[in-house]
UniProtKB/Swiss-Prot annotation:
Residues 1-73 form a transit peptide. One of its GO terms (cellular component) is thylakoid. The lineage of its organism: Eukaryota, Viridiplantae, Streptophyta, Embryophyta, Tracheophyta. Phosphorylated rapidly (e.g. within 5 minutes) but transiently at threonine and serine residues after wounding. Residues 19-29 have a biased composition (Polar residues). PANTHER family: PHOSPHOGLUCAN PHOSPHATASE LSF1, CHLOROPLASTIC, PROTEIN CONTAINING PDZ DOMAIN, A K-BOX DOMAIN, AND A TPR REGION. This is Protein MET1, chloroplastic. The keyword Lyase does not apply.
């Protein structure tokens, strides 16, 4: 409750009535004065009752308006517009998890794809669109609530041992993507009353959203590179992972994944680094000379799995191997 300002003294106290000296008066005048006072009281009483009547009317109107709003809300709720409650489940997966994730409009982490034959696929529990609500910590048995996308992906990639995941089952509904869903479009059209202009508005919203996401990806990439340059690899990973979760172009995905691999290499996280490097190669990264000479990847190059990984994608190496095989077949390599 707020206090009334001091400029309104009537809200604080009533002014005292003026004092008059008692004088001898004509009885008739006294009676008349008394009559006027009684009349004034009568009028005050009537006006009070009138005020109460108006207040009662206003209350009735307010109640009717409230009932109308309630009925309107009930009708609106009949279309299934109420916030939906989702089932949760908990499951443990082994590496390779066989899951791809994306960043939702709310900054959360959602399943974007389930790779056939992976640990997640074998459980039969996951569906595309399910939301991550908690995961195992990097070490031990502690459970960490899912933070924003970059931090959650950092935890998942760094996890040593089986990964326990607490999920929110969305039943295949991917409603938190960057664009308006079909359900949202239909709802918007119904509320707008005229479809054509609303559709144009939705298309414009989607265009602006894509433009905004692209600008954000570029910003995250620049900040990630700066963090990496300053040796702040964990902060850099959050930015690069955010790029990867925001529907990047193949070129953006390849560059971001390559930098993720470099960061994990500097943090001596070999398996996570090799996984990110594989994603970079699958996204079209082809600077194999740089991969074999970049000092940031030195730790990964020491791994026995490094060369076999590159040989899967390096066509120049494949062609060289094919030529050597042919030479051996026809005896050209014999001295």
């Amino acid at each position: 409750m707020s206090l009334a300002p001091s400029s309104y003294p009537s809200l604080y106290s009533s002014p005292s009535l003026p004092r008059t000296q008692q004088t001898k008066q004509n009885p008739s005048l006294i009676t008349q004065s008394s009559f006027i006072s009684a009349k004034s009281l009568f009028l005050s009483s009537n006006s009070a009752s009138l005020c109460n009547t108006h207040v009662a009317k206003r209350r009735n109107l307010a109640l009717k308006a409230s009932e109308t709003e309630s009925s309107a809300k009930a009708e609106a709720g009949g279309d299934g517009e109420e916030e939906e409650k989702y089932e949760t489940y908990e499951i443990e997966v082994e590496q390779p998890y066989g899951l791809k994730f994306r960043k939702g409009r709310d900054g959360g982490t959602y399943i974007d794809a389930i790779l056939p034959g992976g640990s997640a696929d074998k459980t039969g529990k996951f569906t595309v669109g399910d939301r991550v609500i908690a995961t195992s910590a990097v070490f031990g048995t502690e459970i960490w609530p899912a933070a924003e996308y970059g931090r959650t992906m950092y935890t998942i990639r760094q996890r040593i041992g089986p990964l326990l995941m607490q999920m929110e089952k969305r039943n295949g509904k991917a409603e938190d993507t960057g664009e308006l869903t079909e359900k949202e479009i239909i709802r918007a059209e119904r509320n707008a009353g005229y479809i054509s202009s609303r559709l144009r508005e939705i298309q414009m919203q989607n265009y602006l959203k894509k433009k905004e996401q692209k600008a954000q990806r570029e910003k995250d990439l620049r900040e990630g590179l700066q963090f990496s340059k300053n040796g702040k690899y964990e902060e850099a990973l959050e930015r690069f992972e955010s790029v990867l979760g925001s529907k990047p172009t193949p070129e953006e995905a390849s560059v971001a994944s390559y930098n993720v691999a470099c960061c994990y290499s500097k943090l001596n996280q070999v398996q996570a680094g090799l996984s990110a490097l594989e994603e970079a190669l699958k996204s079209g990264y082809e600077d194999f000379k740089r991969i074999r000479s970049d000092p940031d990847l030195e730790t990964l190059r020491k791994s026995k799995d490094f060369d076999p990984l590159l040989k899967q994608f390096d066509e120049s190496f494949i062609n060289e191997s094919a030529i050597n095989a042919i030479k051996s077949l026809f005896g050209f390599n014999k001295k």
